[in-house]
Structure formats: structure tokens, C-alpha cells
Design a protein with these regions (language model features):
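Enzymes that bind and transform nitrogen-containing heteroaromatic metabolites
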Residues: 1-126
């Protein structure tokens, strides 16, 4: 699981099966590993793409619009899973940063968990 530092600090305890996963956390400040958590402070996208070429399971990018935008710019996202929280805030941050290229998606699945719609998309043409 790859996540930004803020998402890591906010959500780690609520992630399912967190104890069984390996976490890569993007952080501007270098830190020593903590158990199954490795902090990445250099070129996070390049480090994760190097892992993608190795045998193993899927890489999951969790939370962090800035981090997700970096991976979208690198054309490194195969699937998108987006949860929509049922809260109207009136204003807020964008999900993704401005300036990322358009990506055409196909809705593969829609489920609802505890009142939260979860939309699963694949890239069109891949």
C-alpha cells in the first residue's frame, strides 16, 4: 500500500488487514522504517514503479490527491477505486491536481459499504 504521509497518519488504524500489509509512505522528511512501514522521500513514483516490475501482488495507492496526481502524470495507474463520502462541505480541495492529462475510464463495479458508494474503474483502451 502506497500512501501520502497525511493519509498514513489519518487512516492507518482504519485500514482493513493493516497489520498484514507492507506500507510505503511518501514523506518529504526522511525517516527510518517502522515495522512494515517504509518511508520514501526521493522519487516515490520511480521507487514504486521499480517494485511493480517485481513478482508479487498488486500495488494499492491509498489517499492523497497530490500523490495520486504524480502517478497519473507518470501513466502508472491501471485501476481507480473511488469512495464518495456522503458529506457536503461547500468547499474543499480537488481530488486531483490541475494539469494532469485526461484519463478515460470505464465503470467496472459499483458497491455501497456503510452508506459510502465505492466506484471501481479501469482505464479505457488498456
Amino acid at each position: 500500500i502506497v500512501m501520502g504521509r497525511k493519509a498514513y497518519e489519518d487512516c492507518l488504524s482504519s485500514l482493513p488487514e493493516a497489520a498484514e500489509k507492507r506500507f510505503l509512505v511518501a514523506s518529504r522528511t526522511p525517516r527510518a522504517p517502522e515495522g512494515r512501514v517504509v518511508f520514501l522521500s526521493a522519487d516515490v513514483v520511480a521507487e514504486v514503479l521499480a517494485l511493480k516490475d517485481r513478482p508479487g501482488k498488486h500495488i494499492w495507492l491509498f489517499g492523497g490527491g497530490e500523490l495520486a496526481s504524480d502517478f497519473i502524470r507518470a501513466d502508472a495507474v491501471d485501476r481507480y477505486i473511488v469512495g464518495i463520502l456522503p458529506v457536503i462541505r461547500g468547499k474543499g480541495r480537488r481530488l486531483f491536481q490541475e494539469g494532469i492529462p485526461p484519463v478515460e475510464l470505464h465503470l467496472d463495479r459499483c458497491t455501497v459499504s456503510d452508506g459510502i458508494p465505492i466506484l471501481e474503474y479501469s482505464r479505457r483502451g488498456r
